[in-house]
Amino acid sequence: MKILKKLIFAVCLLFLLTAGCIFYAFRIEPFRISVNTFAMGAEESSAEPVKIVQISDIHIKEDFTYKNLEKIVERCNRLSPDFVVFTGDLYDNYAKYSDDSHLISELKKLHAEYGKIAIWGNRDYGGGAVRKYQEIMELSGFTLLK
C-alpha cells in the first residue's frame, strides 16, 4: 500500500512538473524580454561608451502579436542605442506568415545613432523566407550582412 501511494505521488509530481515546463515554454518564455548590460574595454578610457542593442530570435508566427514586437521596439528605443544588431530568426516559418507591411512599419521604428545591422538566422532561410527576409530587413532600414 505504501509503495502504491509513493508511486501515485511520483506520477502526479512528474505530471505537474511536465505540465509546468510546457506552460512555461509556450506561454511565458516566448514573451519575455531580457535586458543585460555589459561593460567592455578599458575602464580608464576617456572615449564615450558605445551602446549596442542586440535583438534575436523573435520567431514571428501565426499567433505572434504585434504587441510583442511593439514592446521590443519600445524597450530598445528607451535604451538609446548607438547600434541595433538583429542576429536572425525573424520568422518561425515564413510560409505561414504574410503581413510584411506591419512588420516593416514596426522595425522601421527602431532608432540607432549609427545604424541598424542584421545577419541571417537559421530560420530565415526556409519557406520562401530568403527573398523576403532580405527585403523586409532592408526596407526596415537594416544593413543586411551577407
Where are these regions (language model features)?
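Short loop/edge segments at beta-strand edges and connector loops
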Residues: 146
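N-terminal membrane-anchoring alpha-helices
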Residues: 1-46
